[in-house]
Amino acid sequence: MLFTEEQLKLYSKPLSESEKEKCENAIRIIQESLESLGYETKKGIHRNNEDTLSYQIKMTNPSKDYELSIFVKGSYATNTNVRQNSDVDIAVVKESEFFDKYREGKTRENYKFVSSNKPPYHFKDEVEEALIERFGRSEVRRGNKAIRINGNTYRKETDCVPCFRYRDYSNDYMDDPNNFIGGITIYSDKGERIINYPEQHINNSVIKNNNTNYKYKKMVRIIKEIRYQLIDSKNENAKQTSSFGVEGLFWNIPDYKYSNDEMLGDTFNALIAFLIDNIDKLREFKEPNDILNLCDSQEKNNVYKNFILDVKNYFEYSGEKKYE
């Protein structure tokens, strides 16, 4: 398909101010819901990073002596979302409890940690109860990993993700309780433990964007829009490639590749050319958090390979007008 510079310029723009307001409202309503359970706001709504939409709130429950961190994660947090009808992901993190990992021969006893006496799903039950009380049963739907809150003209459709902290002590050789790689652990209703690193993702996207003279996020928005177009045309590889995944592909491209050309289309072609040249090295790529592998299976590796080839065949650039 032939794309003009003006089209790409449109795709590369961040969402409107009204979308930002709805995103902010989504986190605020979760804050208000948890107040009914006795939580108090310790630090009001603020941005975790001024260059993102990663709104955050800190709450505490004096009677239970623990804190919550509530923050926007995913593509809204990194400001790379491209379709207005997509939902916003909000993590509700219980800071006082964490899942852990240690190097061989070490256990929590070496760090003088104690086990929680509550099952992981108890916290999700508590959050769900607060949301139902605030919105009513018909507006709240519990899923395997998240609790969905229906959207309206005031707020975005929201996936509220109750979770715990994660601490990886694998590289600590001093039994130092503060020496860990931190993330979050989502405990699903099916008993799965999902570990990810949303805060590193947010911060790394800001660094990458700054290092590429703000071209990185523009290019990510363009590839995400093209992915949606391929999905609309029934492309199976695009369907199996997540929004986070295509962002990860572009995050692994060296910064200097973003500065070769002034035109959006020329820059995009240069990035796709790099992926084609390195298509057999995708197993070495990292997620934008720079911790987990982007392709953790041969199946995913094959999907990403085919997606890259499909984008190359789909994207044609007419060339015109330099962007500001």
Swiss-Prot record:
Cofactor remark from the record: Binds 1 Mg(2+) ion per subunit.
Gene Ontology molecular function terms on file: ATP binding; GTP binding; metal ion binding; nucleotidyltransferase activity; RNA binding
Coiled coil: none
Chain sites annotated for binding ATP: D89, N144, K145, D159
Source superkingdom: Bacteria
Outcome of swapping K13E: Substantially reduces synthesis of 3',2'-cGAMP, weakly binds cabRNA, reduced protection against phage
Keyword tags: Antiviral defense, ATP-binding, GTP-binding, Host-virus interaction, Magnesium, Metal-binding, Nucleotide-binding, Nucleotidyltransferase, RNA-binding, Transferase
Substitution effect: K9E: Does not make cyclic 3',2'-cGAMP (3',2'-cGAMP), does not bind cabRNA, does not protect against phage
The protein's required cofactors: Mg(2+)
Protein name in the entry: Cyclic GMP-AMP synthase CdnE03
Organism: Staphylococcus schleiferi
Gene name in the database record: cdnE
